[in-house]
Amino acid sequence: MSAPADNQARDEPLLVARQLSKWYGRQLGCRDVSFELYPGEVLAIVGESGSGKTTLLQLLSCQLAADAGEALYRTRDGALRDLAQLGEAERRFLFRTDWGYVHQDPALGLRMSISAGGNVGERLMAVGWRRYGAIRSAAAEWLDRVEIDRSRIDDPPRTYSGGMRQRLQIARNLVTNPRLVFMDEPTGGLDASVQARLLDLLRGLVGELHLAAVIVTHDLAVARLLSHRIMVMKGGEAIEQGLTDQVLDDPHAPYTQLLVSSILPA
């Protein structure tokens, strides 16, 4: 994916990781991971199972506490805040307003027993919307944007296909115009045709909404299509990072070379 159109030199980073580290007892989760993410930029974190990419995503999204290092987020007032120093109420506020989180399993990010419109509307109510007509109208518009027929607005997601559930989860996350979205294997477990449709949708929305995103994926084709920058992880460490096309077309680390040659078509 080509770089964002905006000149990043004029922006300040939205999310900063400085030597983030996490252990599970004696087992390393990740160690000394550092990067900066700018507004409108998408970072893909790739690597095989157990490489540390999911641990890193959980650290960045405040689901785990780091053992060393820090994760900093630039709030809307321009302050760069240490996420570890935020109270629980402040973190919940971030997830309601500034952040989204797209799970690999949509059931983790949706309420399966309430309607699709209710799932989207809940996010709006959490940021202060109160008029039923406006909430329902916004939910219907977002169903359109994620290519779900409006006639399904009153159906619960348990009646949806896997691809539809994932698109609904995306609508639920993006309806409040977040600045940063975390995605954990967003296309995992989907058939190839469904995955391709979802990728096209995600790519369009990320560009249209000028979203910053951190995407964990094992699929280098997904990373190439969606991300501006890529980080390759192995054994809990970031062994290579840079512009996605440059890293995938000319990998320097031996492990990255192996990963690219074994997964990407010649």
Q: For each of these PLM feature ranges, what is it?
A:
Residues 61:
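Helix-to-loop junction immediately C-terminal to a conserved catalytic motif
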Residues 156-160, 164:
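Conserved ABC ATPase signature
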Residues 134-151:
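Conserved ABC ATPase "signature" region
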Residues 46-48:
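The feature captures the beta-strand-to-loop junction immediately N-terminal to the Walker
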